[in-house]
Amino acid sequence: GYKVYWADGAQLPPQHAAAIADELTRIDIFTGVRSMDYEQALAEGRIELLGEDCDRRFMANVMGMVNDYETVKKVADDFGLVYTPFHGCGYKLVPEALTALGIKHLIPVPEQMVIDGNFPTVVSPNPENPEGFYLAIDLAKKNDVDFILGTDPDSDRVGIMVRNHEGEFQPVTGNQTGVLLLDYLIGAMKRSGKMPANPVALKTIVTTEMARKVAESNGVKCFDTFTGFKFMAEKKNALEESGEGKVIFSYEESYGYMLGDYVRDKDAVTASMLLTEMAAWYDAQGMTLFDALNALYEKYGWYAEKTHNLVMPGLDGLRDMAKLMKDLRENPPTEISGVKVIVRKDYTDGSVIDCVTGAKSRMELSGSNVLRYELEDGTVILVRPSGTEPKIKVYILTQGADAAAASLRRLRYFMMVRTMPRKPHSPRRTVLSSPEWEPPHSIPM
């Protein structure tokens, strides 16, 4: 397939996509269609190639997002990072942006700086998968740097790895990276005088609630959207056209970040530049991003998230997915892993049910096949079918009094989620329980 963008530069929102699909049903697409030699079409101006001029305009906007050249300059002699584009198109503009920022010690992974759609050095070029960073980790250890940056092949998503207190590199999740960047941007924009009136942050409904805590604790409103940047772009347009707010940052847990007014989609070039500026700023404070993340947990609370995929392959997969969602609606759980469900939300029709009082209400968001369960201990469980693969995605958003408590609670719900049936059943199921288990002796961050 392919992506279609509207005049504002964003992917088509559902209403426009539906209108185009409806129009396609009204025409015979072969009527009047002519073929033409590519070179002839190019010569006649029927094909327009985007060239260096487009890159220059884009990069001018990217560098206009810089908040703190001075701090980068102060640490530039000692601060360094490793970068990999995973054989993709980030190999050109990401290093250009970081060099323009003032980074002197940018260490690329040479084997992965070559565009190659076979991705010969990795099993998967997805920055969500830490296994792909093995070459970058070796390079970072040899060069004694604490920060690794990796962009996916089409350079719209970015993942980072940071050195922990044991000297090893660990991945920072999309949820955590977004929280780090949001908190940094709020401070940096205030320090540089760039903070607009009525600032707003956007996140998806399946992204950590820690983002809301960070935003609202610093005077920034936070709104939820459905998964996908077409919805974030639509919300950004609506808020700014109405004068209700100015969006300073939008992100989702799957490593996508939207910044500025010149892009209405996730953009790894701008995100990479600002993540590097952030890492340099913390370096000037004597902190790594691992230190910074722990400081944010100490300040805002210990949050923990986990996503689990219930894969339903084969010819029956789509049917089983639909049946499971239907079963959850008709026989909603009253408890999950021994904890009471206090609020149920169905984003299909926007309905909200208070399970304690029985009161019913409506929320603003509706029109997406997602179920949300809010539990007595503050945990949120969301369930939705994937739009592209034969699987049900289950999101666990929880928190605890400290790192161990948050991780333990996440593990408890994760074990329950793993036991959810791939095959829906008809008997009434009011309790979702995890099997008997023993807490681990140590809980990783």
Language model regions located:
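Phosphate/diphosphate-binding loops
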Residues: 1-28, 125-150, 179-185, 197-211, ...
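Short Gly/Thr/Asp-enriched flexible loops that form oxyanion-binding sites at enzyme active sites
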Residues: 1-6, 156-175, 211
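Gly/Ser/Thr-enriched, mixed-charge loops and adjacent short helices
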Residues: 2-132, 138-140
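Long hydrophobic segments that form regular secondary structure
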Residues: 62-66, 74-98, 102-104, 133, ...
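Gly/Ser/Thr-rich loops at beta-strand to alpha-helix junctions
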Residues: 85-91, 155-157, 206-209, 315-316, ...
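Phosphate-binding and adjacent anionic-ligand microenvironments
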Residues: 141, 145-147, 168-170, 188-384, ...
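Metallocofactor- and cofactor-centric catalytic cores in central/energy metabolism, strongly enriched
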Residues: 380-382, 432-445
